[in-house]
Amino acid sequence: MDQNFKLLDQAIKRFENFPNQGTLFYDITPVFSNPQLFNFVLTQMAQFIKAINAEAIVCPEARGFIFGGALASKTQLPLVLVRKANKLPGQLISASYDLEYRKHAVLEMSTTSLIQANNAKRCVIVDDVLATAGTVAAIDQLLKQLNGETVGYCFLIELKKLNGKAKLQPNVVSKILLHY
């Protein structure tokens, strides 16, 4: 394993029984406080995003925004934000999904999101953790409603035991930096 990946793995803190009994939580916030490490992560993700010729970066709140905003700046691609229900004004589309820790959540996007993103069609979904893939599936639905196409998925971490990768669109490439 490359030294940078070892440092990245060491920076991520583990908390047992959080937020629920029996859950192992991976805290990625130390990565953000280390500029060199955060830049390493962004560089890995940006190279992938450029290689797949994405036209826009789509990310969910909250931690997805951290990666998405930095990557939009680094790649010079438009950023499309996906919000939790009742956080956006205007005409919206929505999709429901289930999370690892709770059932039934809703994500929303503006109906003009892709138009404002230079009429982007080829979208990469970026988030911090791939767990059950519920969030990603909801974003896939939203993009389809807007005639967008998911051309890639990009995550810092995959939680393999939750089998989220198997639920991603089968013909869409993905970049995952760490697998736990």
Curated annotation (Swiss-Prot):
Keyword annotations: Cytoplasm, Glycosyltransferase, Purine salvage, Transferase
Example of a GO cellular component annotation carried by this entry: cytoplasm
Reactions that this protein is recorded to catalyse: AMP + diphosphate = 5-phospho-alpha-D-ribose 1-diphosphate + adenine
Keyword Glycosyltransferase: yes
Pathway(s) served: Purine metabolism; AMP biosynthesis via salvage pathway; AMP from adenine: step 1/1
Compartments it resides in: Cytoplasm
A GO term, aspect molecular function: AMP binding
Enzyme's top EC category: transferase
EC number: 2.4.2.7
Keyword Protein biosynthesis on entry: no
BP GO annotations: adenine salvage; AMP salvage; purine ribonucleoside salvage
Main location: cytoplasm
Highest taxon listed in the record's lineage: Bacteria
Function: Catalyzes a salvage reaction resulting in the formation of AMP, that is energically less costly than de novo synthesis.
Family to which this protein belongs: Belongs to the purine/pyrimidine phosphoribosyltransferase family.
NCBIfam families per record: apt, PRK02304.1-5
Self-association and partners: Homodimer.
HAMAP family on file: Aden_phosphoribosyltr
Entry protein name: Adenine phosphoribosyltransferase
Organism: Mycoplasma genitalium (strain ATCC 33530 / DSM 19775 / NCTC 10195 / G37)
Origin organism lineage: Bacteria, Bacillati, Mycoplasmatota, Mycoplasmoidales, Mycoplasmoidaceae
